[in-house]
Amino acid sequence: MNNNNNNKKLNKENLNEIENWNEIELTDYKKQGLDEGTSSNIYLFESNGNVVNGSIEDSPKQQQQQQQQQQQQQQQQQQQQQQQQNIISSDEEIEDKPFQDRDSNIGDGSDIDSSGDSIDIENTDYSILVPFEDEENNNGSKSKFSIKKLKSFLGPALFISVGYMDPGNWATDLEGGSRFGYQLMWVLLFSNIMALFLQTLVIKLALVTKNDLAQQCRKEYSKTVNIFLWLILELAIISTDLAEVIGTAIGLNILFGLPLIAGVAITSLDTLLFLAIQRWGIRKLELLILLLLSMITMCFVIELFLSKPIASEVFSGFVPRLNSDSVMVATGIVGATTMPHNLFLHGSVVKSRKIPNDRRKSVIKQAYRYNVIDTVLALNCAFFVNIAILMLAASVFWKSNIQVTELSEAYRLLTKLMDGKLAAVLFGLGLFLAGQSSTITGTMAGQIVMEGFIKLRIKPWLRRFITRLLAIIPAAIVIIVLGDKGTYTLLIISQVLLSIGLPFAVVPLIIFTSSYEIMGEFKNRLSIIIINSIIALFIIGLNLATIFQLINDFLHNDSIISKCLTIIFLIPLSIALCCLLLWLIISKINFFTNLLSKIFNNNNNNNNKNIINNNNNYSGNTINNQTIQ
């Protein structure tokens, strides 16, 4: 026990100098292994303000506190035993309850209207209970890697990988491959690495704070800023849904010959599909996603064998190079690969794996490790599909000097150029499956974003209907006015909009996970901060280049309408978005000042060490010289 504490009289004035005095003394008392009857001089601060110098056995209040602590420990042990009894195998860990049977709060959530159905996959009766042991076993060795535990964590990243191979990705990959060959493969690789870094930050934020990114934004920013962020993310989700509508319609056209406008109308019925699958448990939902993704992957494995790309040309595509003509397509690839709403969805689905409430460092580290493995496996699968699409376009279309401007045109060209209908049918089937799998995660992401930012909760089917309606209207107008070619242009624009919305998710994510006040000891290391800052600067720079190119193209267009829209709408909107992004950074200026001070302190410490070493060397040399003399 601390002697300084024992010699110090406590009173009301200096009580705050030593927080939780009795708790400190009890802890020391237990650490010394003293028996209950052993006398130990301590100071007890009574409720009346008197200080009593006595022993533990003479203090009824101390004995009462000790009994209460023992009772609490017994209750905790009973709860842990009960929790261990409830832990079952990974295939039986899911409480397969429907979405609408769940009614719990988001974050603090006491002020959220819980009437109506909600997609709250964090709730314990719709989650997976994962068994955990301490990072250090009794013999002091680290806990071993567990396949059974990994199986419990596999799944959340499947929802994220869906967004990395939706019809919007197909459009940008096909255009990139048919126009520039293998030249943009490095953009896909960099986008995948970038996505892995960002998704791991999302995992860390969710595990440490128990909040997804939208909930944390609501805590850190004002209501006005949150409303603007919500609107930007809603636009990104509608853009994603627009790609799903067009992709599904084209897939139906390829497989069954349905007119595009009829296919767009049919896509509105997928609300009924979501109403059906929302009654499933989360593991069955993950298995459905896995089945769809496996079928898409197999389609393109066969496509690659049929297209026979040249290996040397494939590897040359990983050398970074970019020109003014490919900037727009590269931006679309980045937006299609690293989708902003995925950063919000991932944090929420990660919380479906329930870990012990004590939030021990070892538990969080284990959960983080298994979630990262899940993410790496799922995103690399999505990366393979995207690379396969671009390689297919390069080896078939670019080699034949054909630029693809429509997805349906890609189907017809595959039939002609590859001497058979198998590749074309697989292409149409994969496109249809990609549209349907994206439908499932789109509604989940929209509900999470809406609840997280503005605490608004509506029924999932109503949310799905509104989002799909906002996507169907522009798709139908474009098909009627411009025909099939217009849908392809609309797909590219939707992916550019996704990329423009990405910084508004990435910047807060990096700031939050690098803050000690939010993350504690789990905050990002300096090297991770630098890497993610480079990623953010790359995204912002690419978006600025795209916006400038769009403004320049519209201003030099002969159409008066294009010039008016640019001056009245596009330029003010671009300025407003830049101002909002700056505000997200400036409002957290303490983070940047702390970061700079940390960098300078490290430099000063290194300089001081060098000075000390030089002085020591100089002193040593001086002594040696004197000795010689």
Curated annotation (Swiss-Prot):
UniProt key word Transport: yes
Cytoplasmic topological intervals: 1-151, 204-224, 275-286, 348-376, 443-468, 513-527, 587-629
GO biological process, one term: intracellular manganese ion homeostasis
A Pfam family of this chain: Nramp
Glycosylation (residues): 557
Principal localisation: membrane
Membrane topology classification: Multi-pass membrane protein
Keywords noted in UniProt: Cell membrane, Glycoprotein, Manganese, Membrane, Symport, Transmembrane, Transmembrane helix, Transport
Region (Disordered): 50-119
GO molecular function, one term: ferrous iron transmembrane transporter activity
Membrane-crossing segments per the record: 152-172, 183-203, 225-245, 254-274, 287-307, 327-347, 377-397, 422-442, 469-489, 492-512, 528-548, 566-586
Any Gene Ontology CC annotation: plasma membrane
Residue spans, topological domain Extracellular: 173-182, 246-253, 308-326, 398-421, 490-491, 549-565
UniProt xrefs under InterPro entries: NRAMP_fam
Intracellular or extracellular location(s): Cell membrane
Low complexity: bias regions: 62-85, 106-118
Superkingdom of the organism of origin: Eukaryota
Biased composition (Basic and acidic residues): 96-105
Family: Belongs to the NRAMP family.
Free-text function comment from the UniProt entry: Divalent transition metal (iron and manganese) transporter.
Name of the protein: Natural resistance-associated macrophage protein 2 homolog
Gene source species: Dictyostelium discoideum (Social amoeba)
